[in-house]
């Protein structure tokens, strides 16, 4: 369960990171991206572990609120599932249609940018 939560928070952070403050960005990057402990972050910023913990929880809530309103992550995952399904269908049904396969690959590349 913790792994899924971390994956979700990291994904939301990737989408909504520009909307966060510098402090929120720093704490999130260190904790989720660089695997710092609360104590290490607290020491780095000369604050208490509780302050770091509280900031991280508030930021997680903010990220979830953004997602609830904007649905960027949800729509991204839905598009990826659809693209995977299309790619599998084309590969199975039209394996020799090079133009169609290039078009599907082009769509996939757009999502990765």
From Swiss-Prot:
A family per Pfam: UPF0122
Gene3D superfamilies, per the entry: Winged helix-like DNA-binding domain superfamily/Winged helix DNA-binding domain
InterPro entries associated with the record: RNA_pol_sigma_r3/r4-like, UPF0122, UPF0122_fam_protein, WH-like_DNA-bd_sf
Function: Might take part in the signal recognition particle (SRP) pathway. This is inferred from the conservation of its genetic proximity to ftsY/ffh. May be a regulatory protein.
Similarity section: Belongs to the UPF0122 family.
Protein name: UPF0122 protein LVIS_0949
Protein's organism: Levilactobacillus brevis (strain ATCC 367 / BCRC 12310 / CIP 105137 / JCM 1170 / LMG 11437 / NCIMB 947 / NCTC 947)
Phylogenetic lineage: Bacteria, Bacillati, Bacillota, Bacilli, Lactobacillales
């Amino acid at each position: 369960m913790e792994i899924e939560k971390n994956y979700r928070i990291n994904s939301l952070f990737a989408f909504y990171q520009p909307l966060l403050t510098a402090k929120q960005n720093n704490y999130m990057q260190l904790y989720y991206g660089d695997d710092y402990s609360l104590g290490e972050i607290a020491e780095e910023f000369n604050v208490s572990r509780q302050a770091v913990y509280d900031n991280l929880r508030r930021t997680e809530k903010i990220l979830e609120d953004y997602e609830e309103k904007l649905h960027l992550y949800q729509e991204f995952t839905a598009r990826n599932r659809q693209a995977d399904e299309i790619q599998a269908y084309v590969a199975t049904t039209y394996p020799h249609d090079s133009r169609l396969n290039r078009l599907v690959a082009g769509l996939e590349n757009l999502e990765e940018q």
